[in-house]
Amino acid sequence: MLESTRDHGTQPLDGLLTRWDITNHQLVETSVEQLNHKQVQRARKGRQLTLHLMQKVARTVNDAVLEKIPKDRQPDFKPYTHKHLFNYARDHDPAWPDPNEALMSP
């Protein structure tokens, strides 16, 4: 695989974490699956990840986002999947509207 095909540029994950005001450190601290800072940074910057790691990042993002949402609004949360967070994932839709936009703090 060529080096240029492994770098996909800044990912939708980066914008999502910015909108939710979640830092790399908060994501690592939230992770119960031993996600590390290097993996999070690679995910945000677009370095190609394995499917397993993309799914691990997606689960951790969901956990971190749930911590940001008030308990009474948590049932309205729609979990993110890897295809929402990475533009090189199969079935990624760049026009996908975030169903959790209304849950974000002003």
Regions found by a protein language model. Name each.
Residues M1-E3, D7, D21, L66-P106:
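Short, charged recognition helix plus adjacent turn
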Residues M1-T30:
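A short, Lys/Arg-rich alpha-helix, primarily the initiator
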Residues Q11, I22, L35, L49-H52:
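Residue-level signal for the short linker/turn that defines the boundary of a DNA-recognition helix
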Residues G15, E29, R42, R59, ...:
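DNA-binding alpha-helical recognition surfaces that contact promoter or target DNA
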Residues H25-N36, A58-V65:
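DNA-recognition alpha helix
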Residues V32-L49:
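Recognition helix of helix-turn-helix/homeodomain-like DNA-binding domains
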Residues L51-K71:
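DNA major-groove recognition helix of helix-turn-helix/homeodomain DNA-binding modules
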